[in-house]
Amino acid sequence: MEQRKNYTGYGQRTNNYSNQNREQEIHKIEKPLHIYYADKSKLFLPDGKAYKIALSFKGITTHQLRKILNQVKLCIQELGNKDADFNDVKNQLFMLLPLSAYNGGRDPKLKKIYQFLVEHLNQNSITCEKDIEVFDELFTSVIAYHKYLGGKLDVGKCL
């Protein structure tokens, strides 16, 4: 019996991980967010970063975005406690990365969220409480613009 050229064995797929360096393709912010986004006008105004990110989230439900925002809000709330350990809160925030990777693996539309989180959440970008607060402000603004643009179905029609 003749074997197929691309057959690699039972249960094996060819080119399963064609982009093994996906994270390297994503621009990671390499300085604290409160410094990177010091000019709030470039962040919050309709031609700013939050609006552009909301446009890129076309096809993603508000529910998926709010799941992440809820975790960010829990981190902010935890920082308000006197006993809060910043490293614990930071690690809790970093747990969003594998969660979003899993969701992106299940639904390709959600990979944009993972890419956004990889860009914004790393050891260099989250160095103090103020960075987590800036991330919260950014993501809250993204969701607001996403909703304004029509959420999942109509993002991009309000241009």
Spans of model-derived segments:
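Small/polar/charged residue-enriched interaction surfaces, especially the RNA/DNA-contacting tracks
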Residues: 1-159
